[in-house]
C-alpha cells in the first residue's frame, strides 16, 4: 500500500491513486519479471532463471525458510508441496508429540491466537499501546514538573508519541470520511449503470448523466484511472481505501480497543514461550501467502508462479495482525523458527515504536548463535532509516538506546522497480547508507494469495522474500557457508547501477546513487551470488 500522506494529498486534489502500482497498460510486464535478467530480458530482475541454469546437475539440501507474517494458506496449490512438515508431530491428535510445547504444530505456529481456536485479526499500532501505558502517568505533567532522569526521558518520548498519534488520527478520520463518500458515490453510479463492476467500461462512464459536481469529479477520476487498469480495479482500490482508514480509526488508533485477551498469555512476561494455537492461516493470510510464494512457490509445475528458490520448505509462523506486531511475539517467532530447523527467517513487517527491544535483541542473538540468517523489510515510508526508527533492527542497544552492537546474521532490504532509470528506487521504499543493506525487486510482484489465487502486490514486504529466497538457494547448494558468509556473498554480488535515482527529501526530492543510500550500493543478483559462493567455497577447500 502506498503511504498515507500520498493518499491524503491525492484526495485533497480530487485525484485518487490506485493502491497498487500503476503501469501504462500498453506495456505488458512479465509476471515473473523479478526472476529475469537485465541483459537478456530488459528488466531489473535478479537473474534467478540464469542462476538456476548454472545450478543444474548440482546436489542440494532442503532448506527450511520461516515466514514470520500474518498467516500462510497451507492449502494453496502452488505452496502445499513446499511446506515444512514437523516430522515428529502427528496431525490432529491434540498432543504435543515432539515435546516442544506446541500442540499439533504440523506446519508452524500461531502466536496471536488462543487455545480455544480464536485469533487476533485487528490490533493497535505500537504507538497506541504505548500511549495507553504512559498516559495515566504523564497526561497531567508539565515541562516544569520535577522528574527523575528516567521519567524525563519517558515524558519526552510520550510527548512525541502524542504528536504522532494525533497526526495519524487526523489523517485516518479525514481518509475515512473522504473515501467513504467516494465509495458511496461510486455505488450510486454502479447502481444507475446497472452492470457488475467488472463489466463497466469507459463507454459506460462517457454515457453516464451526472447529477452533481461531485459525481462529475468521480466520473473524471474513474476515467483517468481506467488508463491504468479496469473500473473493477479502481472500485476495489476505493473499497480498500475505505477499509484502510476505517481500520486505522476504529482499531489501530483506538485506545479503548485491546484484543490481547484473545491470546490468553501473561503479556508482561516476556520469557513466556508457550501460548497460541496451530492455525497458521488465520483470518487474513494474503500478505504472508504472497511472501511465501515469492520465496518458494513450486517451480515449473505449470501452476501460478515460480518462487526464487527450489529445495525449500516454508515454515509458517503467524505473529503479525492487522496492526503492529508485538515484540514478545516476534521474539518467540524467531526462537520457534530457530528451534525447529529454519536456516533463513523472513520478516516482512516493521513499526516506528518499540515496547521491549531487548526481548527481540536477545532472540536475534539466539538466531545468530545457531547460524540462522534473518531477512527484514526496510519499510514503506520513503524515509531514511539512518534518521528514523524502523523496528526490529539489526542494531543492539542499551537502556539509553545507544547502539552497543550489530547482528552479523541480518540483512535489511529496500525495494526497486522494473527499469533502469531515475524511478528505479520504488517511491515508497525506505533507504539508509548504514541501515539498509541491499535492494531487491518490490514493485508489481505477482505471487500467491489465499484460495489458490494470484495477485500483484508491492512493497519492501515483497523485496525481502526475494532476498530470503536467494539466501535459501545459496544455503541449499552451499550448505557449508555460514549465515554471515551467505550475507557476505549476497552483498558482494549485487548489481551496481550507474544511474542516479529519485528519493524523497525535506525539499521534495533529490537524485542519488544507490551506494549513497545503502551499504552494498546495489540490487541483489542470484547469478552473481552463485558465482561468488562458488569462489568462497573453493577458497575453503
What are these regions (language model features)?
Residues 338-340, 344-347, 358, 408-412, ...:
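C-terminal subdomain of the subtilisin-like protease fold in secreted/lumenal serine endopeptidases
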Residues 372, 393-476, 480, 522, ...:
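Extracellular S/T/G-rich loop segment that most often corresponds to the catalytic His/Ser-adjacent loop
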Residues 24-38, 140-171, 183, 187, ...:
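Short acidic, glycine-rich surface-loop motifs adjacent to enzyme active sites
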Residues 1-25:
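Bacterial Sec-dependent N-terminal signal peptides
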Residues 70-74, 116-117, 301, 320-324, ...:
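Solvent-exposed loop/turn segments at secondary-structure junctions
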Residues 51-64, 72-88, 93-326, 406-409, ...:
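Subtilisin-like serine protease catalytic core
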Amino acid at each position: 500500500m502506498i503511504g498515507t500522506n500520498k493518499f491524503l494529498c491525492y484526495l485533497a486534489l480530487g485525484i485518487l491513486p490506485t493502491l497498487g502500482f500503476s503501469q501504462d497498460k500498453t506495456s505488458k510486464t512479465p509476471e515473473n519479471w523479478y526472476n529475469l535478467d537485465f541483459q537478456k530480458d530488459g528488466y531489473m530482475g535478479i537473474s534467478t532463471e540464469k542462476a538456476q541454469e548454472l545450478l543444474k546437475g548440482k546436489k542440494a539440501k532442503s532448506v527450511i525458510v520461516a515466514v514470520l507474517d500474518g498467516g500462510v494458506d497451507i492449502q494453496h496449490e502452488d505452496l502445499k508441496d513446499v511446506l515444512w512438515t514437523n516430522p515428529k508431530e502427528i496431525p490432529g491428535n491434540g498432543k504435543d508429540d515432539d515435546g516442544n510445547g506446541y500442540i499439533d504444530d504440523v506446519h508452524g505456529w500461531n502466536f496471536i491466537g488462543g487455545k480455544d481456536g480464536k485469533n487476533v485479526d485487528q490490533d493497535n499500532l505500537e504507538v497506541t499501546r504505548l500511549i495507553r501505558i504512559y498516559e495515566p502517568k504523564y497526561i497531567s505533567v508539565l515541562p516544569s514538573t520535577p522528574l527523575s532522569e528516567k521519567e524525563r526521558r519517558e515524558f519526552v518520548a510520550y510527548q512525541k508519541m502524542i504528536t504522532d498519534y494525533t497526526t495519524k488520527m487526523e489523517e485516518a478520520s479525514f481518509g475515512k470520511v473522504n473515501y467513504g463518500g467516494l465509495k458511496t458515490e461510486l455505488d450510486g453510479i454502479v447502481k444507475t449503470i446497472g452492470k457488475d463492476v467488472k463489466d463497466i467500461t469507459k463507454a459506460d462512464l462517457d454515457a453516464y448523466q451526472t447529477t452533481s459536481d461531485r459525481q462529475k469529479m468521480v466520473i473524471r477520476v474513474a476515467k483517468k484511472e481506467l488508463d491504468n487498469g479496469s473500473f473493477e480495479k479502481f472500485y476495489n482500490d476505493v473499497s480498500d481505501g475505505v477499509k484502510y482508514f476505517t481500520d486505522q480509526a476504529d482499531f489501530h488508533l483506538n485506545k479503548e480497543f485491546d484484543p490481547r485477551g484473545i491470546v490468553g498469555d501473561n503479556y508482561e512476561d516476556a520469557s513466556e514461550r508457550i501460548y497460541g494455537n496451530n492455525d497458521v492461516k488465520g483470518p487474513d493470510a494474503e500478505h504472508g501467502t504472497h511472501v511465501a510464494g515469492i520465496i518458494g512457490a513450486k517451480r515449473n509445475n505449470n501452476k501460478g508462479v515460480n518462487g526464487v528458490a527450489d529445495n525449500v520448505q516454508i515454515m509458517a509462523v503467524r505473529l503479525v495482525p492487522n496492526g503492529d506486531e508485538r515484540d514478545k511475539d516476534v521474539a518467540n517467532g524467531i526462537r520457534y523458527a530457530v528451534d525447529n530447523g529454519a536456516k533463513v527467517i523472513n520478516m516482512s513487517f516493521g513499526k516506528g515504536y518499540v515496547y521491549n527491544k531487548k526481548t527481540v535483541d536477545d532472540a536475534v542473538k539466539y538466531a545468530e548463535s545457531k547460524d540462522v540468517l534473518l531477512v527484514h523489510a526496510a519499510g514503506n515510508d520513503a524515509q531514511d532509516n539512518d534518521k528514523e526508527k524502523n523496528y526490529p533492527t539489526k542494531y543492539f542497544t542499551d537502556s539509553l538506546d545507544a547502539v552497543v552492537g550489530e547482528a552479523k546474521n541480518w540483512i535489511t532490504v529496500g525495494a526497486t522497480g522494473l527499469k533502469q532509470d531515475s524511478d528505479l528506487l520504488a517511491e515508497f521504499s525506505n533507504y539508509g547508507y548504514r541501515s539498509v543493506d541491499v535492494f531487491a525487486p518490490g514493485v508489481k510482484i505477482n505471487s500467491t494469495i489465499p484460495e489458490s489465487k494470484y495477485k500483484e502486490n508491492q512493497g519492501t514486504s515483497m523485496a525481502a522474500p526475494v532476498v530470503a529466497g536467494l539466501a535459501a538457494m545459496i544455503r541449499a547448494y552451499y550448505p557449508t557457508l555460514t549465515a554471515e558468509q551467505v550475507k557476505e556473498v549476497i552483498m558482494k554480488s549485487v548489481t551496481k547501477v550507474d544511474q542516479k535515482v529519485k528519493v524523497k527529501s525535506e525539499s521534495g526530492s533529490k537524485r542519488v546513487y544507490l551506494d549513497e543510500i545503502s551499504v552494498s550500493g546495489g540490487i541483489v543478483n542470484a547469478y552473481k551470488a552463485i558465482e561468488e559462493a562458488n569462489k568462497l567455497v573453493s577458497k575453503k577447500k
